[in-house]
Curated annotation (Swiss-Prot):
It is an enzyme of class 3 (hydrolase). SMART domains: RAB (SM00175), RAS (SM00173), RHO (SM00174). The keyword Magnesium applies. The lineage of its organism: Eukaryota, Metazoa, Chordata, Craniata, Vertebrata. This is GTPase RhebL1. GTP binds at residues 16-21, 32-38, 63, 119-122, 149-150.
Length: 183
């Protein structure tokens, strides 16, 4: 019988970057054509990875901006984060940097299980943020970077599989740098 693990993942980013579309495409397998601003929504899906099952509880958040205050519900009990920007919006890329800093301050950790996602890759003709910029930012955080398209269902499954792996990587890394002796 597989081990079932519960993982809560918050999806954060500027407004209209496709956070809801990513979550909906992952869980329901379809693209939402209309835009309805999200206040907060949740999605659930069970994923099998190796011999383990992961029950993912996705928190789809309202769009944040530079001055948004992250509620503790986005920090306490959250195992990992998908930070999303729109490849056609430099502003959304700048906001994601600010969100990461707020998460670090809220957690008080240097290592966070984060996946940086450049969404709307299908609109590359209007691109304002190059993939190399996203990759460089993710590397500076020690995170993984991916570009996706919720409309084209490009790498959607991979995003959420990867965030599960990031959570495990960060959880397993704590304690490796510490040296102590109990007496």
């Amino acid at each position: 019988m597989p081990l079932v693990r519960y993982r809560k993942v918050a999806i954060l980013g500027y407004r209209s970057v496709g956070k809801t579309s990513l979550a909906h495409q992952f869980v329901e397998g379809e693209f939402l054509k209309g835009y309805d601003p999200t206040v907060e929504n949740t999605y659930s899906k069970t994923v099998t990875l190796g011999k383990d099952e992961f029950h993912l509880h996705l928190v789809d958040t309202a769009g944040q901006d530079k001055y948004s205050i992250l509620p503790y519900s986005f920090i306490i009990g959250v195992h990992g984060y998908v930070l999303v920007y729109n490849v056609t919006s430099l502003r959304s890329f700048q906001i994601v940097k600010n969100l990461y800093q707020k998460l670090q301050e809220g957690h008080g950790k240097t290592r966070l299980p984060v996946l940086l996602v450049g969404n709307k890759a299908d609109l590359s003709a209007d691109r304002e943020v190059q993939a190399v910029e996203g990759k460089k930012l993710a590397e500076s955080w020690g995170a993984t970077f991916m570009e996706s398209s919720a409309r084209d269902n490009q790498l959607i499954q991979d995003i959420f599989i990867r965030v599960i792996q990031e959570i495990a990587r960060v959880e397993n890394s704590y304690g490796q740098d510490r040296r102590c002796c109990l007496m």
